[in-house]
Amino acid sequence: MGSGFSLFQKNLSSCYGDRDLLQPGLGDLPESCVALILQNLDPVEICRFSKLNTAFHGASWADFVWESKLPPDYKLILEKILGSFPDNLRKRDIFTFLSRVNSFDEGNKKAWVDKRTGGLCLCTSAKGLSITGIDDRRYWSHIPSDDSRFASVAYVQQIWWFQVDGEIDFPFPAGTYSVYFRLQLGKPGKRFGWKVVDTEQVHGWNIKPVRFQLSTEDGQHSSSQCMLTEAGNWSHYHAGDFVVGKSKSSSTKIKFSMTQIDCTHTKGGLCVDSVVVYPSSCKDRLMQI
């Protein structure tokens, strides 16, 4: 790809007129050839080079260029998000839509396609999870948070039995995915207009470890445990990985949980924001969530 970039950079001037009119340049390439070039670039690069000249702009709308960037099951993904597959959409329009963060399941889930890799990403809010005791205001409450994609998080003040369960049924494209719980020790708030985190009620998480579990309908399973120790910052705790095979052309159902049910002590002061499913190759992008 690097050599392709250098070729473009060396010939940029040829599109604008600082060359001999008898010398061929990028502006002379037929649109069909340009489309074949663009097919080998990532979506961000395609959009950048579409501004180069008329041929590049026209080629950037070719359906076969964007078909290669879309997840193979993009129709199923659109149906899951929208409830039906819209007619008369060009492939570039479909990619543009999917690369935005789209809400579904009454706003409790969000899904999008990574613009660089084309990998599918998904997250489900605390309200989309099954949390033991969530309706008892002595223990749990939903509080607003600017740090959440869903504008609110679940906060446990104090509890003996801590259990959070969830499941996702979605047409994931083939690949390996990682599941994370996004958590924070401490209660978010504001003081004099500044964001603050109150850690006064944080307790009990360094006595016994929290157990994270993940399973799929085809028998994959993983389990891990760790202490929660980092107060005041949002952290992603790995629940496990799962693999979607290339031959699968339907939804994949996963179940996951986070528990600390040792009732010899209470624990509290924890925010549960969401559960995130990300292509394992894109772990470095987690901090952007």
Curated annotation (Swiss-Prot):
It is found in: Nucleus. Pathway: Protein modification; protein ubiquitination. Pfam families: F-box, PP2. InterPro entries: F-box-like_dom_sf, F-box_dom, PP2-like. It comes from the Eukaryota. Keywords: Nucleus, Ubl conjugation pathway. Component of SCF(ASK-cullin-F-box) E3 ubiquitin ligase complexes, which may mediate the ubiquitination and subsequent proteasomal degradation of target proteins. The F-box is necessary for the interaction with ASK proteins. This is F-box protein PP2-A11. It comes from Arabidopsis thaliana (Mouse-ear cress). The gene is PP2A11.
